């Protein structure tokens, strides 16, 4: 604001103040004089009552007019649309104000175009970002809008309500044991592997930081947590003693021998009555671990009852073509009882 504009503003405010003082001073003289004249007359009480009553009525009438004007002004403002911008001289007589409004409108338009698409990917903690907001060079590992905290909480819920820790069902724990207690009992106690001990401590620290820090889980923390789960899942598989009982199976993945050898799981591998029993009869105890069922190594096959072994033994298999023909015949004769899953 220039010096001349400041001078004009100061003169306007000063003159307004002086005018208001004079108006109030002259207005007060009339009621004071009326009260003084009424008190000197013969009927002092009656005249005073008339003068004071007239002043009260005048005051109430003025207040009523002011309130009515305020309500009328408010109703007029309601008729104006909220998105209406006063840019015309009739709405906003002050020229500088109109120019400021127009300049801000142009600036808002430029900012809208500039900020419509962020310069860098916007990734918030706690949720997996959508593909359009992700870094182009990063591999998409998880579904969009995946809640990291819910996934981590499901691990403890499975441990708490189902007794399942990672992929091990045989978890010896008490009701008051925490996640850290289970990790210590599984991978820290009586363990001489320094790498596993270090990773187990990092696993516990990371879990407690995620669950009890009160902050959203970052993407790096969640990826690190998943890596720890996969690592200790593989460790628990290799340390599971129930795998030692499965070495007696002769799998047909890389051998021409179809069937099973004599073992503690079956007295006679070609006994049809034994095959009619439950599949879990072949195991000394139910398995206590989770395994993949998609690989060849998890399926053991035996000769189905639909194959004529007598005729096959009368003609020894001398050539590869005979072996292939028998293998094709066996594959067509398999039933659901000829598959043992573990």
Curated annotation (Swiss-Prot):
Extent of the signal sequence: none
Subcellular localization(s) per the UniProt record: Membrane
Membrane topology: Multi-pass membrane protein
Cytoplasmic topology ranges: 1-15, 69-342
Extracellular side: 37-47
Keywords for this protein: Membrane, Transmembrane, Transmembrane helix
Membrane spanning stretches: 16-36, 48-68
GO CC, alphabetical: membrane
Family of the protein in this entry: Belongs to the DLT1 family.
The protein's role, per its UniProt record: Required for growth under high-pressure and low-temperature conditions.
Protein name, per record: Defect at low temperature protein 1
Species the sequence originates in: Saccharomyces cerevisiae (strain JAY291) (Baker's yeast)
Gene from which the chain derives: DLT1
């Amino acid at each position: 604001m220039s010096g001349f504009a400041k001078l004009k503003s100061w003169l306007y405010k000063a003159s307004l103040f002086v005018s208001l003082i004079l108006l109030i001073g002259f207005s007060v003289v009339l009621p004071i004089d009326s009260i003084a004249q009424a008190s000197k007359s013969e009927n002092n009480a009656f005249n005073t009552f008339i003068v004071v009553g007239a002043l009260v009525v005048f005051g109430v009438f003025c207040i009523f007019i002011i309130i009515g004007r305020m309500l009328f002004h408010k109703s007029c403002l309601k008729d104006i649309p909220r998105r209406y911008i006063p840019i015309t001289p009739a709405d906003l007589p002050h020229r500088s104000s109109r120019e400021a409004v127009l300049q801000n409108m142009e600036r808002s338009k430029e900012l809208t175009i500039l900020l419509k698409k962020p310069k860098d990917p916007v990734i918030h903690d706690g949720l997996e970002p959508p593909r359009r907001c992700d870094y182009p060079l990063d591999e998409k590992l998880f579904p969009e809008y995946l809640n990291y905290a819910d996934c981590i909480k499901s691990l403890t819920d499975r441990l708490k309500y189902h007794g399942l820790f990672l992929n091990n069902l045989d978890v010896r724990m008490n009701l008051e044991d925490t996640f850290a207690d289970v990790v210590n009992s599984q991978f820290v106690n009586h363990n001489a592997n320094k790498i596993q001990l270090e990773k187990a401590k990092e696993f516990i620290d990371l879990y407690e930081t995620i669950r009890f820090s009160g902050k959203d889980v970052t993407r790096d923390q969640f990826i690190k947590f998943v890596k720890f789960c996969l690592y200790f899942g593989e460790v628990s598989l290799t340390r599971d003693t129930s795998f030692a009982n499965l070495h007696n199976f002769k799998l047909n993945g890389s051998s021409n021998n179809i069937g099973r050898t004599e073992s503690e799981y079956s007295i006679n591998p070609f006994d049809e009555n034994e095959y009619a029993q439950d599949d879990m009869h072949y195991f000394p105890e139910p398995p206590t671990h989770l395994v993949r069922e998609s690989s060849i190594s998890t399926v053991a096959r035996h000769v189905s009852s639909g194959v004529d072994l007598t005729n096959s033994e009368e003609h020894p298999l001398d050539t590869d073509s005979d072996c292939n023909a028998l293998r094709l015949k066996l594959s067509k004769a398999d039933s659901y009882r000829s598959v043992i899953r573990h």
